[in-house]
Amino acid sequence: MKKATSILLLLALVATLACALVACNPADEEWYVEDGAEVINVYLRDFEEWSNNYTIDAIRRFNSNLTDGIQVEYTLLLADQYENKVQSDREAGKAPDVYLISYGNLLTAINYNYILPLENVLSQKMIDDISESAKDYVYLKEHLYAAPFCFEPSIMLFYSKKAFATAGVTSAPKTYAEMLDACAKIKPTLSKAQYVVGTPKGLPMGWANIGQFYNAAGGNLPLSDDWSESLVMQNKEGYTSFLNYYTSLYTKGYTPLQDCAGGYNEIIREVCEGRAAMTFAGSYAVSTIYDEYPECVDDIEVAVVPTMDGTSNVATTTNGGWSYVLDAATAKRKGADGRTHAELAAKFLEFLLTDSEVAPEYFEKANYCKSAGYNSVIAATGKEGEGNKYYAEIARAASNAIATPLYNYDITTECSKMIEEMVINGKSADQVITTFDNMVKQIIRQSGLAGKNPAYRGN
């Protein structure tokens, strides 16, 4: 049985308005409750509406087994509240059994012993099913610490063919110069209520642009592979070119200073609803186009983001995404039958992430703009994705993408601060790069990062 769409939409709406939806059991007969079952608490993070609905329905389907002794209850939290809620509940001794962590934040959770190694709780079948590429993200310090959920290029360029044609722009810009030239042509054709290009603001300004900074620096992150020294000044020329180009989008009035409604997760709506001619967005924007704006599919195209020299078969984005983890305390929490919460939660994760009917459905609903971390799910969804008009370009970006860095997120925050300082405070690229270099050195020193990269294998 499938839950009525209206009920699922109502659940998502209530969650958004209330900021958290705790153990929500709809009144109809389709929400299953097993009397006497051990409750496993899951914290869900607010994503796209279709994604929230999928996960809530998957929980409902898992709970339809009224003999396994497991009852999954969830709390749906807004994105900007998620990490603080997990942290505060952990400190209060009320951490959820299961929650989501982005791949770039796994190492911090491991270092603080927040999460449980999974080798002894997940089934061997599920462990063997993890794809080779996904293993690089979830195996750290010689242990499996997370169950991969999805992978997705963090930034692509989506654009309206109609808006481009009106302005005489014949193709997607490949270089910084072409991008600025296209913006200059498009701006005079727009009304006062429209703007040229959407860009990530706030926190996403950092993580969404990691790949662009990496590309500008000639394929280098801001610090050495062993995390012992800053590489910022070695790559000053590339950073300067990127920063001057990117901040021009603001200073020339091509992108607004304020964020759009819904933030970076929903920024594709700006193009779909005619407020912007193009936008940077994660690959997941494809699903919003297909599901909510099918009339825009013919008009909106996608391309790899511009690079300094126009080379597109290189890394321009991170393969971002999310994994499910078990709180360390789940190994000690036990139900009446003696099974630990870790054992019970593992049953749910296996169902959610690898069940032959449930898991592929997520990527179908995503319109194949994301990739799975399990061989069985990849095999079940790969061919269908080739019929998606956006699939080839997104797959190209994903194949060249880098993993989200494992070092302190403070460094990524400092990257976005360079942009902010130039746009808001009028500082030069030279000034902000010098400050960035000093901050990277300070973070390396204060956090003791030198030699601590778990992925470093030597020269």
Whereabouts are the PLM-identified features?
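Extracytoplasmic/periplasmic solute-binding protein
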Residues: 140-149, 155, 180-231, 247, ...
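Glycine-centered hinge/linker elements that transmit conformational signals in sensory
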Residues: 183-184, 228-261
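Conserved N-terminal structural module of periplasmic/extracytoplasmic solute-binding proteins
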Residues: 6, 18-108, 126-127, 309-311, ...
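Hinge/lid segment of periplasmic solute-binding proteins
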Residues: 101-155, 180, 191, 209, ...
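Long, aromatic- and glycine/proline-rich binding clefts that accommodate carbohydrate-like moieties
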Residues: 24, 300-305, 362-421, 449-459
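A structural signal for short loop-to-beta-strand junctions that line the ligand-binding cleft
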Residues: 89, 94-97, 126-164, 311-319, ...
